[in-house]
Amino acid sequence: MSVIYLDNNATTSVAPEVFESMIPFFTEKYGNASSMHTFGGQVGKSIQDAREKVATMLGAQPEEIVFTSCGTESDSTAVMSALQAQPEKKHVITTRVEHSALIALGQHLEQKGYELTYLGVDSKGRLDLDELSDAMRKDTAIVSIMFANNETGTVFPIQKIAEMVKERGILFHT
């Protein structure tokens, strides 16, 4: 029986060339990159080389690149960094259909005194961009909306959302 995998929003296999490049780190170069010994230092150098390559591709500085271990950590780092950089702003916008990790972070932020706006979706899973526009305020620190819903597969109009958010001078995370 042949299988068709339709849940690539949740997890995706790595490209063969990525797998090949990672084999040494699964078999020989598995030291702790933070260790002071040579074994760890070799891994640390590989991570720094990767950071520099990513920075070059993005037109950024290597010290601006942060590697995380998973999507949950990535989302939390992005949102928390935005809030720490703008302590005077206490409002966050996201959707009711975000990944559970972001919903949990939102609940945590509400307990810490932040105000969250959770945008709804229609019966087809689409966002109302007028609702987003109305929700943005002077104290909005960040808008965090996933590119595509991991349960329904609905793709959100990220380019349009990014333009709307940028016009208002608000940080955007997707």
Where are these regions (language model features)?
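Pyridoxal 5′-phosphate
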Residues: 1-174
